[in-house]
Amino acid sequence: MTRQKILITGASSGLGAGMARVFAAKGRDLALCARRTDRLDELKSELGQRYPNVTVAVSALDVNDHEQVPKVFAELSDALGGVDRVVVNAGIGKGAPLGSGKLLANKTTIETNLVAALVQIETALEMFKTSGSGHLVLISSVLGARGVPGVKAAYAASKAGVRSLGESLRAEYRSGPIKVSVIEPGYIESEMTAKSNSTMLMVDNATGVKALVDAIEREPGRAAVPWWPWAPLVQVMRVLPPRLTKWFA
């Protein structure tokens, strides 16, 4: 099934903007939202020039402003005449070692990556129930497969939470009419990973985003991307002794 009208959160940069470019090249209409409206406007202009037959609607949205999420989703849906896929992508990579006295960074990460994701999920489900169908895509991470020490502890926990919500929804809607996919990116070049000390198995943005979109289009229940090496590595991560998980942090 071709999902023609796609809403992406956190679309002003990184994986969100990359997905928007790839979907636009496929001729899909886009509803894009993020905090940085200047970047969104630039992206809309870029896509409009390259793909004049594609409709691109943009709106400012801070996903931590929970009351705004349903309002912005509704406005963007109206602009496109409906939405049949929502990609819950907005997130941050802040963090500090647990017990380091830097609670705010970890709290903000959990709130943005998990609590705000829950708000987006609830909003998308209401939209899909009204329309009768839809594809909900949750962007988790390979780090959601296993807790890790250091600065990524809260990030990994938040993405594990997203993964768990997705698994619950897949069971809830196992017979439809809503499809749910949990996508677990490995290390893909972006503004977020540029701030990371780990470059292990990093792939360039274009390669990573293509793998991401290809996986979304297949509408799997769950997928690590790029498949190689991350799909087998995720299985390894789940059984590693705790002392060895530092290599993924």
Residue ranges and their predicted role:
Residues 26-43:
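Conserved glycine-rich Rossmann-like NAD(P)H-binding loop of the short-chain dehydrogenase/reductase
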Residues 141:
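Residue(s) in the substrate-gating loop at a strand-loop-helix junction
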Residues 37, 60-71, 103:
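The beta1-alpha1 cofactor-binding region of Rossmann-like NAD(H)/NADP(H)-dependent oxidoreductases
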Residues 12-14:
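Conserved glycine-rich cofactor-binding loop
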